[in-house]
Regions:
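N-terminal secretory signal peptides
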Residues: 2-34
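N-terminal secretory signal peptides and thylakoid transit peptides that target proteins
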Residues: 26-50
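Binuclear metal-dependent hydrolase catalytic cores centered on His/Asp/Glu-rich metal-binding motifs
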Residues: 166-188, 200-246, 256, 318
């Protein structure tokens, strides 16, 4: 019905009548002439814009673009004279053709070139959508990630898709995920409600990794589930045994509303910046708090940085939020 009406307009209408203001401000009822040729050009222009935007969102931004998002901050809990550089890799979603092994290798090289003190990975290593030519198995992408190098090491947590895509773990309600086993097999520690203390030039800090907050969401198809997440914020922070500042890794950012001021910085991914972000706004954000934790730097009781991530989930489409590696500088220059 709609298509027939549009066709009738395009083929039969030779003019449109509308009221418009004269130079003296009056309203006239003279016909405002739009030729069929001009109208069809307008429609064709809209179609071309839509087609080019779609092509860019599918074929260019998610595959060919890669940027470094830099943050220089000084949380109240962080010593002003203690500089620490953290490189953040989030939401790879390994699959062909959108996140190939060659693409992951390029990300590894770009990350290493940042010369960060420590590298953290925030989960979602598996594809997370069906629009692929090949799912890249963990025993292929994990060895590539093993090429990441930093003086204080490379440290990882898991994301919801690392849990959701592991059907055995979902059915049994327990066990180590394929992603975790693959990362640990290549020497990358995976934190699940655990912490580790580090020092740089004699200055201490803690790295805390939270279990995923949505881990067993698909398991509800197989059996009743008492608790969806495997996260335990209180247990995790209870393992911090002194007053050195804490950096919390949490795949989903929503936990920030419960994170106490004891934590200096929370690093999260998951949202992909909405995957479509125009003029600082994302129409769809996988967060209970909408735009609040969609992307970038904000502050609750602690500072929170949400990465736009590197890959795609649901659909291999990005517009206005290019894939990114994040580099956070705490203290030092950030305090100036």
């Amino acid at each position: 019905m709609v298509n027939a009406a549009l066709l009738d307009i395009c083929t039969n209408a030779s003019q449109f009548r509308c009221n418009f203001s004269s130079e003296r401000g009056g309203i006239t009822d003279r016909p405002f002439m739009i030729s069929r040729r001009h109208f069809l050009r307008f429609i064709a222009g809209l179609g071309a814009f839509s087609a080019s935007t779609t092509a860019y969102g599918f074929g260019i931004e998610p595959v060919l673009r890669l940027r470094v998002a830099r943050y220089e901050i000084l949380p109240p809990q962080w010593p002003a004279d203690f500089q620490l550089k953290i490189a953040v890799v989030a939401d790879l979603h390994a699959c062909d053709p959108w996140m190939s092994l060659e693409h992951i290798q390029a990300i590894v090289e770009r990350t290493n070139a940042l010369n960060a003190d420590v590298i953290v990975m925030l989960g979602d290593y598996v594809a997370g959508h069906r629009h692929v030519t090949r799912y890249i198995p963990a025993d292929e992408w994990a060895p590539v990630l093993a090429g990441l190098k930093a003086p204080l090491g490379v440290h990882a947590i898991l994301g919801n898709h690392d849990w959701w895509d592991d059907k055995t773990v979902q059915r049994e309600g327990q066990g180590l995920t394929i992603s975790r086993r693959a990362l640990e097999a290549v020497g990358i520690p995976v934190y699940e409600n655990d912490v580790r203390r580090f020092t740089k030039a004699g200055r201490p800090f803690w790295l805390a990794g939270l279990g995923d907050q949505l881990a067993y969401l698909p398991a509800r198809r197989f059996r009743p589930v008492k608790r969806i997440g495997v996260d335990d914020l209180a247990e995790t922070l209870a393992k911090v045994t002194d007053d050195a500042p804490v950096i919390l890794l949490a795949h989903e950012p929503d936990v920030a509303m419960r994170v106490p001021a004891r934590v200096a910085l929370q690093l999260s991914g998951h949202t992909h910046g909405g995957q479509v972000r125009l003029f600082g706004w994302s129409p769809v954000v996988p967060s209970r708090y909408g735009e609040k934790f969609a992307y970038g730097h904000t502050r609750e009781k602690c500072d929170v940085i949400v990465s736009g991530g590197l890959g795609c989930s649901i659909m291999p489409f990005r517009l206005g939020v290019p894939p990114e590696i994040v580099l956070v500088t705490l203290g030092g220059k950030a305090s100036a």
